[in-house]
A protein has these predicted regions:
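Disulfide-braced loops of extracellular cysteine-rich modules
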Residues: 11-22
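Small-residue hinge/turn detector
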Residues: 25-28
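Short, disulfide-bonded extracellular cysteine-rich repeat modules
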Residues: 33-37
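Short acidic, low-complexity intrinsically disordered linear motifs used
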Residues: 38-47
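Extracellular jelly-roll beta-sandwich "head" domains, especially the C-terminal globular C1q domain
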Residues: 52-207
């Protein structure tokens, strides 16, 4: 009878199986024998990988950002300077890409106004290497102490050395009021609501 034809009930178990614990597997020793043990992740030679976006930098501003006058853009800042291998940001809000690739830029802005009568028209835009990309974004605030949050996820292909900046402006068709506002919770243990936040993600191919 060939070995392949032996019924399962008559087959011998692998040597060492009788004393192995539940969940242990046979592991080759490299010397022609096997032992039973729990497989450690470090022992896996061909580990599975995954592709997708990974966060490379996150920054936010904890101060209000108000243009000085109508039709006078203000460059948006995101707190202190930071540097990573793939991307860096200056205290002036200039995002510099240190490596080329496909990026996803998440931005969160909180438009607001505090005083004055009439409608306040607030605009913002994104610039790549100093030139505007995409359409402008805007809100009209008709009441004092009004705030409106805005967020967007923007996919961009960037080369090493490319920069991204953002601006906010008060349009002269409206009143000279408003900008990006911070909200400070009075509830103990709650973090502030920043005036502006940016998260830079890079696509990583795990293949």
């Amino acid at each position: 009878m060939e070995h392949k034809d032996i019924p399962d009930a008559q087959l011998h178990q692998i040597k060492g199986a009788a004393s192995a614990s539940s969940g242990q597997v046979p592991i080759a020793t490299g010397s022609g024998t096997t032992v039973f043990g729990f497989l450690d992740w470090t022992q896996v030679a061909n580990k599975p990988t995954s592709s997708g976006y990974q966060a490379k930098l996150s920054a936010f501003s904890s101060v209000n950002q108000n243009p000085s006058a109508v039709d006078t853009p203000l460059q948006i800042t995101f707190g202190s300077a930071q540097t990573t291998a793939d991307v860096s940001i200056s205290a002036a809000g200039v995002i510099t890409f240190n490596t080329s690739g496909n990026y996803l830029i998440d931005i969160f802005l909180r438009f607001g106004r505090s005083t004055s009568a009439g409608n306040a028209i607030l605009l913002n835009r994104i610039l790549k290497n100093g030139a505007q990309i995409l359409n402008s974004n805007g809100v009209i605030l008709s009441a004092a102490t009004q705030t409106i949050p805005f967020s967007a996820a923007i996919p961009l292909t960037m080369a090493a050395g490319d920069t991204i900046t953002m601006e906010v402006a008060r349009d002269s068709a409206g009143t000279n009021d408003g900008g990006l506002f911070v909200v400070s919770p009075t509830i103990a243990g709650w973090n502030i609501v920043p005036s502006a936040t940016v998260v830079v993600n890079k696509f990583v191919d795990g293949a």
